Amino acid sequence: MKILYVEDNDDNVYMLKNRLSRAGFTVVIATNGAQGIAMANSEQPDLILMDLTLPDIDGEEATRRLKGDPATKHIPVLALTANAMSADRERAIAAGCDDFDTKPVDMPRLLEKIAALKIE
Protein backbone atom coordinates (compact mmCIF):
# COMPACT_ATOMS: atom_id res chain seq x y z
CA MET A 1 0.00 0.00 0.00
CA LYS A 2 1.36 3.41 -0.99
CA ILE A 3 0.79 6.36 1.35
CA LEU A 4 1.40 9.99 0.43
CA TYR A 5 2.33 11.91 3.58
CA VAL A 6 1.94 15.69 3.18
CA GLU A 7 3.87 17.30 6.04
CA ASP A 8 6.25 20.27 6.31
CA ASN A 9 7.89 19.37 9.65
CA ASP A 10 11.07 17.35 9.05
CA ASP A 11 10.94 15.65 12.46
CA ASN A 12 7.36 14.49 11.90
CA VAL A 13 8.25 13.24 8.41
CA TYR A 14 11.26 11.28 9.67
CA MET A 15 9.39 9.70 12.57
CA LEU A 16 6.18 8.72 10.81
CA LYS A 17 7.79 7.65 7.53
CA ASN A 18 10.06 5.26 9.42
CA ARG A 19 7.23 3.85 11.51
CA LEU A 20 4.95 3.37 8.51
CA SER A 21 7.76 1.81 6.47
CA ARG A 22 8.45 -0.68 9.28
CA ALA A 23 4.72 -1.51 9.23
CA GLY A 24 5.04 -2.47 5.56
CA PHE A 25 3.83 0.67 3.78
CA THR A 26 5.53 2.48 0.92
CA VAL A 27 5.65 6.16 1.89
CA VAL A 28 6.19 9.12 -0.43
CA ILE A 29 6.56 12.63 0.96
CA ALA A 30 5.30 16.05 -0.08
CA THR A 31 6.37 19.05 2.01
CA ASN A 32 3.60 21.49 1.07
CA GLY A 33 0.05 21.54 -0.24
CA ALA A 34 0.88 22.28 -3.87
CA GLN A 35 3.43 19.48 -3.98
CA GLY A 36 0.92 17.17 -2.28
CA ILE A 37 -1.69 17.86 -4.96
CA ALA A 38 0.85 17.27 -7.74
CA MET A 39 2.14 14.06 -6.16
CA ALA A 40 -1.36 12.73 -5.56
CA ASN A 41 -1.91 13.02 -9.32
CA SER A 42 1.44 11.54 -10.34
CA GLU A 43 1.81 8.85 -7.65
CA GLN A 44 -1.87 7.83 -7.29
CA PRO A 45 -1.36 6.67 -3.69
CA ASP A 46 -3.79 4.39 -1.88
CA LEU A 47 -4.12 6.89 0.97
CA ILE A 48 -3.09 10.47 1.79
CA LEU A 49 -2.06 11.57 5.28
CA MET A 50 -2.58 15.33 5.22
CA ASP A 51 -1.17 17.80 7.73
CA LEU A 52 -3.69 20.62 8.03
CA THR A 53 -1.16 23.37 8.74
CA LEU A 54 1.04 23.76 5.67
CA PRO A 55 3.08 26.76 4.51
CA ASP A 56 1.42 27.45 1.15
CA ILE A 57 -1.92 25.78 0.53
CA ASP A 58 -3.27 24.52 3.86
CA GLY A 59 -4.40 20.93 4.23
CA GLU A 60 -8.09 21.79 4.11
CA GLU A 61 -7.76 23.63 0.80
CA ALA A 62 -5.47 20.93 -0.63
CA THR A 63 -8.08 18.32 0.33
CA ARG A 64 -10.88 20.34 -1.30
CA ARG A 65 -8.87 20.48 -4.52
CA LEU A 66 -8.05 16.77 -4.40
CA LYS A 67 -11.68 15.81 -3.79
CA GLY A 68 -12.78 18.12 -6.62
CA ASP A 69 -10.44 16.47 -9.13
CA PRO A 70 -11.78 13.35 -10.90
CA ALA A 71 -8.24 11.90 -10.95
CA THR A 72 -7.82 12.05 -7.15
CA LYS A 73 -11.29 12.26 -5.60
CA HIS A 74 -11.32 8.51 -4.89
CA ILE A 75 -8.18 8.63 -2.70
CA PRO A 76 -8.99 8.60 1.03
CA VAL A 77 -7.54 11.54 2.98
CA LEU A 78 -6.78 11.23 6.67
CA ALA A 79 -6.10 14.60 8.31
CA LEU A 80 -3.29 14.80 10.86
CA THR A 81 -3.02 17.84 13.10
CA ALA A 82 -1.81 18.98 16.49
CA ASN A 83 -5.16 20.80 16.86
CA ALA A 84 -7.47 18.48 18.78
CA MET A 85 -10.58 20.64 19.10
CA SER A 86 -13.87 19.29 17.72
CA ALA A 87 -14.18 22.37 15.48
CA ASP A 88 -10.88 21.40 13.80
CA ARG A 89 -12.22 17.92 13.11
CA GLU A 90 -15.48 19.33 11.74
CA ARG A 91 -13.62 21.70 9.38
CA ALA A 92 -11.40 18.88 8.12
CA ILE A 93 -14.37 16.60 7.46
CA ALA A 94 -16.25 19.48 5.78
CA ALA A 95 -13.22 20.03 3.51
CA GLY A 96 -13.48 16.41 2.36
CA CYS A 97 -11.16 14.53 4.71
CA ASP A 98 -12.36 10.98 5.26
CA ASP A 99 -11.02 10.80 8.82
CA PHE A 100 -9.06 12.83 11.34
CA ASP A 101 -6.32 12.07 13.86
CA THR A 102 -4.18 14.13 16.17
CA LYS A 103 -0.44 14.52 16.65
CA PRO A 104 1.56 13.25 18.31
CA VAL A 105 0.55 10.12 16.47
CA ASP A 106 -0.65 7.10 18.42
CA MET A 107 0.59 4.41 16.01
CA PRO A 108 -1.88 1.61 16.88
CA ARG A 109 -4.80 4.04 16.51
CA LEU A 110 -3.43 5.40 13.22
CA LEU A 111 -3.00 1.88 11.83
CA GLU A 112 -6.61 1.10 12.76
CA LYS A 113 -7.79 4.25 10.97
CA ILE A 114 -5.71 3.39 7.89
CA ALA A 115 -7.17 -0.13 7.81
CA ALA A 116 -10.71 1.21 8.19
CA LEU A 117 -10.28 3.65 5.30
CA LYS A 118 -9.01 0.92 3.01
CA ILE A 119 -11.93 -1.39 3.87
CA GLU A 120 -14.63 1.17 3.03
Language model: regions and residue ranges:
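The feature encodes the CheY-like receiver
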Residues: P55, K73, M85
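C-terminal output helix
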Residues: V105-I114
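Charged docking surfaces used in two-component/phosphorelay signaling
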Residues: Y14-R22
